[in-house]
């Protein structure tokens, strides 16, 4: 049996309708999603990740300053372990390190990344290291929107937005698992108006793809994993050239073998597909597909990459599709999961 955990925004300020974390059982025979739990949590469990052994789930509480841990029970449901304060406001991303001893959190308005020790029982312990993202002036910050590992989990990419006072950038850190410390190796700064949001790392660890929220674009960068350096090589739009309206690019994702890159567009309510040249890393736009809903903040493949999902935050739907890597085409399976204000999906 496989499971899906859906983080749902909950607050009136976010115009949200969710109640917390939902657990679903997914039938291996039919693919049907069956809700088995709705765990009411602290506000806005807006992003979550499992530890490497998949025994525990960790969730950040958007717009607040807390991070929570949960035990995954034998029946797939969640039980509370603990919640800690990190100090930085609006944690937006969380990921385990390669040793499974730490969870790393990016806080947007906190302008920082926090390395948190995991206790033996799966609960969250103390913060052992904090990396602050400096802004343009003393006391200003750059807004950390994502912290994600390279494929070897030796380097941490921290994607930051400027929001007038900081820098739109990717800061690269080398990670020391002995003490959880981070040492900067590079800093790529994007165009002033782009507002970088998320990156995806190719399986070969040499190609990095950055989706830019305000620029509505995708940037390709090469990565040297011997010294932790980035170099920008290409930029393509995420919106069709016949579309003249507003847009807010959101998430990026690579297919299993790294041949297809996908980006999601809010307001335009679509995904864009690119084919990746496996020798050079350059992108070629393949086409656009509606997400059949409003505000596709989050996109994901399931565990074996056989199915693709777009979480439409403002229409309360998760839309299932299937990617053919050979042709680079998406097809709709017809399955739509209805859940309130979905903003993150974790498969187990």
Label the predicted regions:
Residues 17, 44-46, 90, 143, ...:
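Beta-rich catalytic cores
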Residues 24-31, 70-77, 115-125, 172-181, ...:
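Short loop/turn segments immediately following beta-strands, especially the blade-tip
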Residues 34-40, 79-85, 128-137, 183-190, ...:
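A short beta-strand motif characteristic of beta-propeller blades
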Residues 50-54, 96-100, 150-153, 203-205, ...:
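Residue-level detector of Asp-centered blade-edge/turn motifs that repeat once per structural unit
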Residues 78-150:
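Asp-box/WD-like beta-propeller blade repeats and closely related beta-sheet repeat scaffolds
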Residues 246-313:
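Loop/turn-rich, solvent-exposed surfaces of beta-rich toroidal or solenoidal domains
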């Amino acid at each position: 049996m496989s499971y899906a955990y859906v983080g749902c925004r909950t607050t009136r300020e976010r115009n949200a309708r969710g109640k917390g974390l939902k657990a679903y059982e997914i039938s291996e025979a039919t693919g049907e999603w069956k809700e088995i739990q709705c765990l009411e949590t602290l506000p806005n469990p807006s992003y979550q990740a499992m530890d490497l052994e998949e025994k525990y789930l960790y969730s950040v509480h958007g717009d607040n300053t807390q991070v929570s841990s949960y035990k995954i029970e034998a029946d797939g449901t969640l039980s509370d372990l603990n919640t800690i304060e990190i100090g930085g406001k609006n944690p937006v991303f969380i990921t385990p390190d390669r040793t499974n001893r730490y969870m790393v959190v990016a806080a947007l308005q906190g302008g920082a990344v926090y390395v948190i020790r995991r206790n033996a029982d799966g609960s969250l312990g103390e913060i052992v290291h904090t990396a602050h993202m400096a802004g343009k002036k003393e006391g200003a910050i750059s807004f950390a929107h994502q912290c994600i590992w390279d494929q070897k989990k030796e380097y941490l990419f921290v994607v930051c937005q400027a929001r007038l006072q900081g820098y739109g950038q990717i800061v690269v850190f080398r990670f020391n698992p002995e003490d959880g410390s981070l040492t900067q190796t590079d800093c790529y700064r994007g165009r002033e108006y782009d507002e970088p949001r998320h990156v995806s790392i190719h399986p070969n660890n040499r190609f990095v793809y950055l989706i830019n929220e305000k620029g509505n674009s995708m940037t390709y960068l090469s990565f040297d994993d011997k010294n932790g350096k980035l170099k920008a090589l290409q930029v393509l739009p995420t919106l069709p050239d016949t579309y003249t309206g507003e847009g807010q690019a959101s998430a990026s994702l690579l297919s299993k073998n790294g041949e297809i890159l996908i980006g999601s567009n809010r307001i335009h309510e679509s995904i864009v597909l690119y084919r990746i040249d496996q020798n050079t890393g350059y992108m070629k736009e393949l086409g656009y597909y509606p997400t059949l809903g409003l505000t596709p903040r989050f996109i994901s493949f399931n565990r074996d990459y056989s199915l693709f999902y777009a979480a439409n935050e403002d229409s309360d739907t998760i839309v299932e599709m299937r990617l053919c890597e050979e042709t680079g085409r998406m097809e709709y399976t017809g399955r739509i999961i209805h859940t309130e204000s979905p903003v993150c999906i974790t498969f187990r």
